[in-house]
Amino acid sequence: MGNVPAKLDQDASSYTGRSTYTDSSSASGVGAFRGAGGTMDETRARGRRTSSLVGNILNGPTSSRNDPTGEVSKKQLSAAKKRGTKERELLKEENAKKLVIKYNETVDGGYLAPHGCYSLDKMDYDSDIVRKLIIERKLAPFYIPLQDFDDSWTKDEVKKIVDALPLHAPFNEHVEEYEDVPVGDLNEPHFDYLIDKKLSKKEQKKMHALIFKARLYRKRLRWQESENNAYLEEKLQNRDNDIPKNSFLPNDDLKYDLYAQGSECPICFLYLPMPLNYSKCCQQPICSECFVQIKRSEPHFPHDEVDPSQPQKDENEKDPNLLISEPANCPYCATPNFSITYTPPTGRKVGIGGQAPNLYKPLGTAGNAPPTYTVSSDDIRPDWETKLNKERVRLARRSANATAIHVSNRLIGPQRTGSFANEDSPGVAGSTDSRSAGVANSTLEELEKQMIDEAIRLSLQDEKRKAKR
């Protein structure tokens, strides 16, 4: 939008030639139109310039910068959108793969991926960051939970119960949302052939997103089942050995030490090995699977007090820069900027960076105490600010589009009707045009100014965003 003045000059010069042609042609035609011809041509030229601004704002700043003519091939835009969609889908698949529990990725008796107490769509944290924090022992690992624990259980009873635990919680194979949704061959990367081409483009887009979600759910189920089967196979082969041959399987001492001194998470009410994470503000325990659910609010406008005597503003009329995303509050005491602290166990360092789980022996607790680490809910979702800015841009464009469409409708409707009427009735042209020319000029000048102001505002916002980066 920074090139608005140049665009206006260019349009003005090109339309001047058209005005000359109109004057010369009208001279040999209707004499009555001659007096008001210059005024009406100027009005039409201004209308075209304003319509050009409307088009620029509707098309957005990107298209006008990439293509100086303002004309971008529809095929190119469509191809770019498809590439963007495919890249986003590949990223989602990669993230889903990292949410699969693997029995050979273990830290201190827990794992790098969640057990499955919550649905996949809630696991939108940065999995690379969480995995790194667990490996560095700055966040409690994801443990396999027990529904309950009885202090009277013997070591053999605890061993049998732990041996029966599945690596991942059972999946619901019949999700209502995905019923009757075709998924096709999951080994094939493309699935557009499953979409009914008779649907509108909007409906096809919705169907594409739904099929992708259903396919991803099925793929994740398949990936996790494969890991579950491998884990079960290894356990069956080593069930009669006090010390498993597979170095990633825990021995009996580790199984007992993990669960004999556990604790219940007050949010999910599941029993898990210690130590857990603790809220920094009120020192309440919270498991990692519950912690990763807690995040900032979605971008929204501040909740101002509503004055019933004043008309309520539509979202399109509000300043997009007022959008906010409030930090997460503690689920226990509602303190803002929620963070947890974690102190790794002193006598148990197994798996990645420690002893082999099958050779576990309790370590001595003498010596320096391990450091305590702090992790905030923003640390595991560092892209919150990017999402907020994207929503601001989206709302700004939506507001600009609404303004542009409104102005365009005001320009096209009465102006074109009046022009066509004058051309069909040349005898009345002089009187009608002379009366309406002043009003038309005034209205178009006002609309042109409004569109220029809008263009400048969007350009300034764009520059501010660039400066922040």
Curated annotation (Swiss-Prot):
<feature type="region of interest" description="Disordered">
    <location>
        <begin position="1"/>
        <end position="86"/>
    </location>
</feature>
<comment type="similarity">
    <text>Belongs to the SIP5 family.</text>
</comment>
<dbReference type="InterPro" id="IPR039301">
    <property type="entry name" value="Sip5/DA2"/>
</dbReference>
<keyword id="KW-0963">Cytoplasm</keyword>
<feature type="compositionally biased region" description="Polar residues">
    <location>
        <begin position="431"/>
        <end position="441"/>
    </location>
</feature>
<protein>
    <recommendedName>
        <fullName>Protein SIP5</fullName>
    </recommendedName>
</protein>
<feature type="region of interest" description="Disordered">
    <location>
        <begin position="301"/>
        <end position="321"/>
    </location>
</feature>
<dbReference type="GO" id="GO:0042149">
    <property type="term" value="P:cellular response to glucose starvation"/>
</dbReference>
<dbReference type="GO" id="GO:0005737">
    <property type="term" value="C:cytoplasm"/>
</dbReference>
<comment type="function">
    <text>May negatively regulate the SNF1 kinase.</text>
</comment>
<feature type="region of interest" description="Disordered">
    <location>
        <begin position="414"/>
        <end position="441"/>
    </location>
</feature>
<feature type="compositionally biased region" description="Polar residues">
    <location>
        <begin position="50"/>
        <end position="67"/>
    </location>
</feature>
<feature type="compositionally biased region" description="Polar residues">
    <location>
        <begin position="11"/>
        <end position="28"/>
    </location>
</feature>
<feature type="compositionally biased region" description="Basic and acidic residues">
    <location>
        <begin position="301"/>
        <end position="320"/>
    </location>
</feature>
